[in-house]
Amino acid sequence: MLIFVGLGLYDLDDISLKGLQAIKEADAVFLETYTSVLTGTTIEQMREKYGKDLIILKRQDVEQKPEPILTAAKNGIAVFLTGGDPMVSTTHADLRIRAHEQGIPTKIIHGSSIVSAVSGLTGLQNYRFGKSCSIPYPAPKWFPKTPLDTILANLKQNLHTIVYLDIQENRYMSVHEGIELLEKLMEGSTDSIPLFVGIARAGSNSPVVAAGSSERLKLVDFGPPLHILVVPASLHEIEEEYLKNFAGYDPQ
């Protein structure tokens, strides 16, 4: 059996009791570290807490070479751990399909997701979000405009946008970097983004949430990762009041 377990957003305490029990009963435990990481803990602490060895997976291990995972699931109980929820803003549906095609039973144990956390921390109503996007670190001759196109298309439809910020090995994009990259993409055009909301360390005891113009957010110390960015559309009255009270938003 292959069991997908969501670890939640921040630290060891975010996992559900069901998820913890699944780990204890597992014959093999895999941890993917490329879609999200729990910055409130370490892999060593996780191994100690769970009493299990964790097999660390990179993107290519899951998307291109999943055979060790599937073999473990054929021979016993394999648990696949991921930050957040296993099937939200991930490509893990493909792994579940592969398992099903090989006759391997599967199960999902959900975890708290950044998608619901964003709505809770910002007060932006969840049904008003459009397509999300991701901002990658640019590479030589590669600086995709897709994130900006997605944001502008959502704004035209009066929809909010969740903007995921790049996660690389020992490198985590900040709110400031994300805004600066969007501004570079808008250079020489008439496009503009009047309002941003930056969030840091969702799920922790002291998350940072700040709303305002790009100039204001560049002055905010968001602190350590993980960060995420939101571009709101026009605000409903309750949304505006929420941001005023909990994100320091000043519409003036």
UniProtKB/Swiss-Prot annotation:
* This protein's pathway: Protein modification; peptidyl-diphthamide biosynthesis
Q: Where does the sequence pass through the membrane?
A: none
Q: Where does S-adenosyl-L-methionine bind?
A: 9, 85, 88, 113-114, 165, 202, 227
Q: What is its EC number?
A: 2.1.1.98
Record field: catalytic activity: 2-[(3S)-amino-3-carboxypropyl]-L-histidyl-[translation elongation factor 2] + 3 S-adenosyl-L-methionine = diphthine-[translation elongation factor 2] + 3 S-adenosyl-L-homocysteine + 3 H(+)
Q: What keywords is this UniProt entry annotated with?
A: Methyltransferase, S-adenosyl-L-methionine, Transferase
EC supergroup of this enzyme: transferase
GO BP: any one term: methylation
Q: Pfam family example for this protein?
A: TP_methylase
Q: Which family does it belong to?
A: Belongs to the diphthine synthase family.
Record's subunit section: Homodimer.
Identification of the protein by name: Diphthine synthase
- Which species does this protein come from? Methanospirillum hungatei JF-1 (strain ATCC 27890 / DSM 864 / NBRC 100397 / JF-1)
